UniProtKB/Swiss-Prot annotation:
InterPro entries: Anenome_toxin (IPR000693), Myo_ane_neurotoxin_sf (IPR023355). One of its GO terms (biological process) is regulation of signal transduction. One of its GO terms (cellular component) is nematocyst. The lineage of its organism: Eukaryota, Metazoa, Cnidaria, Anthozoa, Hexacorallia. Its main location: secreted. GO terms for molecular function: sodium channel regulator activity; toxin activity. Belongs to the sea anemone sodium channel inhibitory toxin family. Type I subfamily. Disulfide bonds join C4-C44, C6-C34, C27-C45. Keywords: Cardiotoxin, Disulfide bond, Ion channel impairing toxin, Nematocyst, Neurotoxin, Secreted, Toxin, Voltage-gated sodium channel impairing toxin. Binds specifically to voltage-gated sodium channels (Nav), thereby delaying their inactivation. This toxin is active on a variety of voltage-gated sodium channels (Nav1.1/SCN1A, Nav1.2/SCN2A, Nav1.3/SCN3A, Nav1.4/SCN4A, Nav1.5/SCN5A and Nav1.6/SCN8A). This is Delta-actitoxin-Afv1a.
């Protein structure tokens, strides 16, 4: 999957670990949405 920046990772992508994964159809079972705003396409989810 494509990595994304969770709210808990920090304010921007530079120098931070991207712990989320982008899911286009929503977070799968057992995962949660970890970013309050965005991404533009899909959801940023983590286990």
């Amino acid at each position: 999957g494509v990595a994304c920046l969770c709210d808990s990772d920090g304010p921007n992508v530079r120098g931070n670990t991207l712990s989320g994964t982008i899911w286009l159809a929503g977070c799968p079972s057992g995962w949660h949405n970890c970013k309050a705003h965005g991404p533009t396409i899909g959801w940023c989810c983590k286990q």
